[in-house]
Amino acid sequence: MRRIVFVIIFASIGSLGAWAQQGISGTVTDQQGRPVPAATIKIKDDNNQAIADSTGVFSLPSIPPLPFTMEISSAGFNTHEIVVTDLKKLTSQFILVNNNELTEVVITSRRRLETAQSVPIAISVITGKQAEDAGAFNVNRLKELVPSVQLYSSNPRNTTLNIRGMGSTFGLTNDGIDPGVGFYIDGVYYARPAATALDFVDVDRIEVLRGPQGNLFGKNTTAGAFNITSRAPGTTPGATFEVSYGNFGFIQAKTSFTGPLTKNKKLTGRLSFSGTQRNGLLYNTISQKHINDLNNLGFRTQLQYRPTEKLKITFIGDITDQKPDGYAQVVAGVVKTQRPEYRQFNAIIADLNYRLPTSNPFDRIVDHNTPWRSGNQLGGTSLNVDYKIGSGTLTSTTAWRYWNWDPSNDRDFTALPVLTLSQATSKHQQFTQEIRYAGDFSQKLNGVIGAFLIDQDLKTDPYHIEESGSAQWRFSQSTSSNLWKTPGLFDGYGIRTNSRLQTFGAALFGQLEWAVSDRFFVMPGVRFNYDKKDVEFDRKTYGGLQTTDPALLALKRLVYTDQFFTANVEETNFSGGLTLAYKIEKKFNAFATYSISYKPVGVNLGGLPTSNGAVMLELARIKPEYVTHWEMGAKTNPTKNSTFNVVFHHTAIEDYQTLVQSPEIGVNRGYLANAEKVRVFGFETDGNLRVNKHLWLYGNLAYTIAEYQQFSNAPVPLEETGSTKSFKDISGNRMPGVSKWAGSIGGELTSNTRKALGNSGKLFFAMDSYARSEFSSSPSPSKYLNVPGYATLNTRFGFRADEGLSLFAWARNIFNKNYFEQLLPAAGNAGHYAAVLGDPRT
């Protein structure tokens, strides 16, 4: 795959005007005190820059209001970042170190600027440049760089984003529960899991925080958080353009423009576009076209107004429209269930004179007679106000977002007219308001306190629809009665569901940091939650044979039934935690955390199972989760050119919210239930090593055990369908979606600075590999629905210019490894199951 990156930086067009502060001047030297000529000094996210002369002297005549970050760089040296909060304390001599020493990464997860190595939190940071170089343009690809992250997606709505195996239900999504992993972009909480399908645009950095973070973020996060920060508008005009080409018709284009919008540069803006297209990776013999393509368009704009040094106002608006013909799954295998022989999948399709198009899922061939569609549209606006008060900043973030979902699925995964329609069209709107203060309260005490409100409205548009076809009788047949063969009995028989979920949540949260000494720090945190959910669910049957025959009506009710229920639930809860941190020395920071947290009450929004013909209304409400968590770790710099971090963690959850599958067609998307107790424990390590100025190595490793300590009323796995028991005790068994081992390793080799393509830059060659051990893909452990372990290798090489034109080629899954990402049973548990396939070599 070839990727061309055009970067056009326009020259400065004037000073900041009368409002600007005084400039900055100084000298850039190396560690031996020798001047570094031609060093670049710039204001981060501003494009305002200067070049040092032959004696290393530079001058930046205009700078933005405090605080800001300076970047000083030169070929052969590490980029040096300086957070400027007080000009009086700023040195006039800036020392660059040889780039065989690692650069510290600055983050804002604790609502202030600090380095990742100094924060007593298990955190992984991926810069925007690292994500772009690795081709990680969305969360699904980013997971390869952070092994503790698991993402499973059979389409954008049915997406599971977990950290350490916790966060959301595995498999299909039920809209009635909250995610345990918070997803934030520029301080705004994104409530819908479909947001993880967004293409990254203008990303500055991605911070992945592991473990409960409810003391720091507005929305409660019991498993962790993604905190994504975009590049801010600059006061100097600039533009970037990037286009990538690849096999399967892949093309991706991104462009961004930034600069001042007024003469005094108090108002600046950034305008960004992105587009991704790729042909389908599966071939449908029925439609005679390739499906599972990519078709994404995104638009994002930012306006930033700085009327004074103390006040910054940022407006952001974005729209993303994704219209792929996807996401189809491939039949991956057939299991013999405990039903009678005539109810086995192979016997059923033999009676219907049907054969699967292939027995090898990696032929990537399907014969689906219902079109696949995943219309995914997200957008919104936000207004962020930062105002410096005393030694801190008061922040207000107001946001409105929407999500429109327009799908079509073939849930029987065959050419047979079994489930001819499965369309859960939905509309969602959310409003959030967060107010917080972060700063120093005294010389030894700092922290963050805040309040958060969220209001959500999710409704069908106009309804969810499931419809059977003429072959449904054979899959539903549970007796030898000839009544099942009644012509037209199930043809066009379906359900239309009107539902609405209205959610309101409020929280007070905060965390303090008390410097007991120069080395010992105590960080207590507390949170109060209020959650209210109101749901109305109304499902009506329609179609099929119109008859008054009680026997035929009874057969129809075995497939679909009317359902109606309402649920009104509300809960309040206190939670909190305590972190102790000790800096043994500058290169060794140890920490330990204990916390209790809470995941709100849930409601079933995909229909309820039945027992002896009666709807199990007791399952309409799902108990909240109670999470007890501890972790301890250390962040170290063994040498000046290396880091090594390790953390041990243990989480116990009571009333774990999980999604379970049912053989009932009426709840083929599964339903929510509580597992009494689960626990997750393990350790994680990550490290970086700058061998010399040419070679950089890095790696991550995660060991995770996730198990049900007590789940006495779990559904039976696929192969036990038809047994005398509908539920079983799976206590002591493993949870789905969690590999015992997962890791990544990589490195980059660069040349000395040279001229190429008319620009100064470096040649580079990089490789990275991601691997994970096998894992269960069934809520109740199965002998068959287990995904084998796999490893993939990616590579890239080319020329990276300091400014101007860069050119490089890259390949993912270079050895074309065939692997599954997820396995899931077909509706009705007839015995066949499908797979979400990993991408081939691209």
Question: Where are the regions a protein language model picked out?
Answer:
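Structural signature of Gram-negative outer-membrane beta-barrels, strongest in the C-terminal barrel
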Residues: 304-308, 437-440, 446, 450-454, ...
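C-terminal beta-signal and terminal closure region of outer-membrane beta-barrel proteins
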Residues: 818-842
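Short acidic/polar hinge/loop motifs at secondary-structure boundaries
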Residues: 59, 172-212
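Membrane-embedded beta-barrel scaffold of Gram-negative outer-membrane proteins
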Residues: 384-389, 393-409, 583, 589-599, ...
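Gram-negative outer-membrane beta-barrel transporters
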Residues: 438, 448, 518, 645, ...
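Outer-membrane beta-barrel translocator/receptor signature
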Residues: 178-180, 192, 201-204, 215-285, ...
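Periplasmic-side early beta-strands and strand-to-turn transitions of outer-membrane beta-barrels
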Residues: 235-236, 244, 260-354, 361, ...
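Short, acidic, small-residue-rich periplasmic hinge/interaction motif at the N-terminus
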Residues: 29-34, 39-44, 71-77, 87-132
